[in-house]
Structure formats: C-alpha cells, structure tokens
Amino acid sequence: RRSFIEINAEFQKALHIMEETNRHVFITGKAGTGKSTLLEYFRHNTRKDVAVLAPTGVAALNVEGQTIHSFFGFKPSITPEKVKKISGPDAAIYKEFNTIIIDEISMVRADLLDCVEKFMRLNGPYRKQWFGGVQMVFVGDLYQL
C-alpha cells in the first residue's frame, strides 16, 4: 500500500459527493487509477456510517469488508422474490447506515443488485426511495471481467 495519497481534482470531487451528499456514486477506472485508495481514504475519514461489501470472499478480504450475501443474510439461491422484510435485533442495523460501498461491482450480477435494492427498500430507513434512501457507492472496472 502507498504511504501517501495524491489528492487531485477528481479525487476531491468524488470525496465531496460521497461525504457531503446522499447521491449514488459509480467510481470506475483502470487498474492503478486509485479506486481502492479512494475507497480506503473515504472509509477511514468519513463521518458517515459505512458498510464495505464485495461479491466474493477474496474481494471482501481485500477491502476489509463482508460479502454481499453475508451482510444481507442472503442464501446462494436468493432471488428478488425471496427478499423479505426482517424483524428482530438485526433489523435495526440496516437503518443505521448512511452509505454502502460495493467494490468489484463488475462481478455483481444484475439480479443480485435487484435483491440488494429490494432488501434496502424493505429494511432501510426510507421505503419509498431507491436502496431505502441509503447512499450506494459502486466501485470497479467494468472492462475487468
């Protein structure tokens, strides 16, 4: 890992949108362009409550996060039709997050993203907003498959 970070104009703009707004963000770029550095910097310097997720166990380890399936309690066979409102002690946690970051977004199937959206709409703070009103930050290189 680099011990210093060059904060250029694009980096500052992305950080501003992530920190100061609730807008959904898609961060892309080739390998070595600073996506992981930006993610790490934001995570360690934000005032927001952030969850960092990835589609696979290895990708989750790389960002010190959890898998999407683990975080939402999804079984491997999850479909949007099977996503339900949850109750009990775990239910409140999904209302506490301001931002959910999903790294390696190019590896996330569209139907799994539909499950995440439905889950957050049912269990997040605002049922009538996309992803339950929680800011989503998608990070990845769509040319890397």
Model-derived features with residue positions:
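Conserved ATP-binding/catalytic motifs of P-loop helicase motor domains
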Residues: R1-L145
